[in-house]
């Protein structure tokens, strides 16, 4: 650039660029399993036999 005597020329150029990226991922998994089994078996057997024989002569 040719600047004439007694003249001032100023040129300013400013460029600012800002980039921010944030990523958050949270995953929670809970599994509960309960199994209860109860089995009861009772068997009772009673047998009574009585025989009486009387003979009188």
Swiss-Prot record:
Composition bias type Low complexity, residue spans: 8-57
Domain of life of the source: Eukaryota
Region annotated Disordered, chain positions: 1-57
Name under which the protein is recorded: Putative uncharacterized protein DDB_G0283527
